[in-house]
Design a protein with these regions (language model features):
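A conserved beta-turn-beta hairpin within the catalytic core of GNAT-like acetyltransferases
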Residues: 58-67, 76, 95-98
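Conserved active-site tyrosine of GNAT-family acetyltransferases
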Residues: 115
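Conserved acetyl-CoA-binding loop-helix of GNAT-fold acetyltransferases
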Residues: 71, 77-90
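Conserved beta-strand-loop-alpha-helix junction that forms the acyl-donor binding cleft
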Residues: 73, 102-112
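Conserved beta-strand in the GNAT
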Residues: 44, 50-58, 65-70
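A short helix-loop-beta-strand connector motif used in the catalytic cores of GNAT acetyltransferases and
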Residues: 32-44, 65
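Conserved GNAT acetyl-CoA-binding A-motif
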Residues: 85, 92-104
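A short beta-loop-alpha structural element at the N-terminal edge
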Residues: 1-11
Length: 115
């Protein structure tokens, strides 16, 4: 993921039922900070040039954290979420991170079904 993906990623987040967003962390500046700190562990999935999935992943040097995994509704069930998760976990492993925490909101029933 790169900062230029922000608008498409943000629209995907907004269209995802149960996604918890806030004005600071999920702003363009917030994502820029996150990507600078975690340049190799955040991913998008594209279909014909359109972003259809995303995952934010970072770590504090000890434990990895997964945030904002989303796949456009008409692309769900095709393995995109699993591929994004595998990419994020692989990126953490390459940095020596072997523990991962997940942020999942109770109200996100679709997302919780995936996890």
């Amino acid at each position: 993921m790169i900062l230029a993906d922000y608008e498409a990623v943000y629209q995907l987040w907004r269209s995802t039922p149960g996604m918890g967003l806030n004005n600071v962390d999920d702003s363009r500046a917030g994502l820029e900070r996150f990507l600078k700190r975690n340049p190799t562990s955040c991913f998008v999935a594209e279909e014909e040039g359109t972003i259809v999935g995303t995952i934010l992943c970072g770590h504090d040097g000890r434990r990895g954290y997964l945030y904002h995994a989303a796949v456009a509704q008409n692309y769900q069930g095709r393995g995109i979420g699993t591929a994004l998760l595998d990419a994020a976990l692989s990126a953490l492993e390459q940095e020596g991170i072997t523990k991962v925490a997940l942020v999942a909101l109770k109200r996100n029933s679709e997302g919780n079904g995936f996890w």
